[in-house]
UniProtKB/Swiss-Prot annotation:
Present with 2610 molecules/cell in log phase SD medium. GO terms for molecular function: DNA binding; DNA strand exchange activity; single-stranded DNA binding; structural constituent of ribosome. InterPro entries: Ribosomal_mL67. Belongs to the mitochondrion-specific ribosomal protein mL67 family. Keywords: Mitochondrion, Nucleus, Ribonucleoprotein, Ribosomal protein, Transcription, Transcription regulation. It comes from the Eukaryota. GO terms for cellular component: mitochondrial inner membrane; mitochondrial large ribosomal subunit; mitochondrion; nucleus. Its main location: nucleus. This is Large ribosomal subunit protein mL67. The gene is MHR1. GO terms for biological process: cellular response to oxidative stress; DNA recombination; mitochondrial genome maintenance; mitochondrial translation; positive regulation of mitochondrial DNA replication; regulation of DNA-templated transcription.
Length: 226
């Protein structure tokens, strides 16, 4: 994956409002080699972002490389405004810090282990990191919507929030894990990313199409609802 220094810095909502470079989205990527998850404000990421998210790598959670062929978009979260998208990104990063640093021991106790006491893995892949990321996404979204100001809650939104998933299995049981009053009131939609193949070259095109879809919701695209 090509290093892009222009996306290495954290960008506030005011910057997105000014540039309109992408719609209010948060991108979540998973590593096909080790199973780790990376959060980004853009449909790409740099070494700086990897370094910030993986501050204490170890044998069970190695710092992943930027090789383009080992990263896949797990989901894209579409919010109603840039303030929400920035808050969601910040919440996800804070929860990652709690899991890996501030509350590392408590978090590690909840992870499935093998007979040697290591985080369970198959080959080198550890599925627990993706599962934790989905749980953190749900909790972060709840905080974003529940902490909205009274004025924001009374304002009729221009569009519904939505999540485009890599596959239905990745989001888990929709009725069990995503059935919350705040989600239902906002009409949170779960959709699937339509793929022809499974290659990194195609993925960049898909992410561009999702951005175009959210910028121009009336246009026809090849994204299917679940």
């Amino acid at each position: 994956m090509k290093v892009n220094h222009s996306i290495s810095r954290f960008r506030p909502a005011s910057w997105f409002e000014k540039t309109k470079i992408i719609p209010p989205q948060v991108y979540i990527f998973r590593n096909l080699e080790y199973g780790q998850v990376l959060y980004s404000q853009f449909p790409n990421f740099s070494q700086t972002q990897v370094d910030k998210l993986f501050v204490r790598p170890n044998w069970s959670n190695r710092k992943p490389s930027l090789r383009r062929d080992i990263w896949k978009c797990m989901c894209v979260v579409n919010l109603q405004n840039y303030k929400q998208s920035v808050h969601l990104y910040q919440n996800l990063c804070r929860l990652r810090y709690l899991r890996d640093v501030a509350q590392r021991k408590e978090s590690d106790k909840l992870r499935k282990k093998d007979s040697n006491g290591h985080v369970w893995y198959s080959g080198q892949y550890r599925p627990t990191y993706c599962q934790e990321a989905v749980a953190d996404l749900r909790e972060s979204l709840l905080k974003v919507f529940e902490n909205a100001t009274p004025a924001e809650k009374q304002t009729v939104p221009a569009k519904k929030p939505s999540i485009y998933w890599e596959d239905p299995w990745r989001m888990g049981d929709k009725d069990k894990h995503w059935n919350y009053d705040v989600f239902n009131a906002l009409g949170l939609e779960h959709k699937l990313i339509q793929r022809v193949g499974n290659i990194a070259r195609e993925e960049s095109v898909i992410l561009k199409e999702l951005a175009k879809l959210e910028s121009h919701p009336t246009e026809q695209t090849e994204v299917s609802s679940q």
